[in-house]
Amino acid sequence: MSGGVYGGEELCALVFDVGHNSFRAGFAGEDCPKTDVPSLIGYIEEAIDSKTEQTDINANNVGSQQSQRRYIFDTPGIKSPRSNMELLTFLKDGMIDNWDLMEKMLDHIYAKHLNLESAHHPVLFSEAPWNSRSKREKLCELMFEKYNIPAFFLIKNAVLSAFANGRATGVVLDSGQNQTSAVPVHDGFVIQQAIVQSPLAGDFITNQCRQYFEEKNIKLVPYYMIASKEQVKESEPARWKERSNIPDNLTSSWKNYMVKEMLQDFKAAALQVGDSAFNKEIAESMPSIHYEFPNGYNMDLTSDRFLIPEALFDTSQIKGFNSTVMGMSQIVTASIGLCDVEIRTSLPGSVIVTGGNTLINGFTERLNRDLTTKTPASMRYKLIIPNSSIERRYSPWIGGSILASLV
């Protein structure tokens, strides 16, 4: 899959890794993807005449001359306020659900980011461990029939994460935007019947943050609304002026996305997972974090910044607690327990931690503590944690880059 030779030039294989947060694409053998594009796509239904020309470099046009759907890609494009722009993703539960949007995204990746002929490059494509046979066949058909690629390899992202960390056997704990999963891998193969999933992931924590601010009566004002702001003292009402040139008819999907981006910034800057089960007195004694919102409102956070992410590990902290929902350490131990006895002992020594949600401060330390204190001493757990945040976010892509360069 390394690419072969075309016209005297060696052509590298391409590696595609798709997640709910972003689509990573690049060349086999590289240390990181060439491009990291949001998995959300904007579109606008608009009427045009035959003389209209499209000048937006982040947009593609399809449809008739009388009416067409204009697509908008990439972070600058989808973050720009536009009238009637809806945001959609092509994924559901980690699997491709909207094939038309997926095709538009691939067109955009090839033309704007990779700038190459698809027919000249083999492709390694990651997939969710629970992906269905019909979806695998449809993706294979799309890549061969539309993009005319010379070779195609579809492989589960948990296996790639294991390879990226030098392991062929272990449990991959992947906590991303949409869900968290524990996937056991043995000699490079996923143990399907032992996959355990949990909805406690990035979007869950983002919603916990939103609920927290609603309870505190703190209004969330995204960047795009603000023309200017004044400095105010801690916890005083914000003094800011609204932009006068905000387009009309901004859609709910776009406004929700902009608020979500703001909450994700708060999450990365302020939240921390405690070393042990939440204790308000201990949390209050920890150093506070000062955080300022885009409109100038600012506050100090003490125990609350530990309480919000605590639900990832102690599900009793969730309001309306559902007893079937498992925390991070529980899904790891449950996954191992579902494996055959013959391979069970080989898994705890390689618990591979990956996914953007694991970058919350204190996440890996708490996971390690819970696994070592809440399980039998005979089960010696060892966390395999990539050295940098980039490696942790891009583990499946990096594993694919390594594998595709060797084949």
Q: Predicted segment positions?
A:
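C-terminal region/appendage detector
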Residues: 1-407
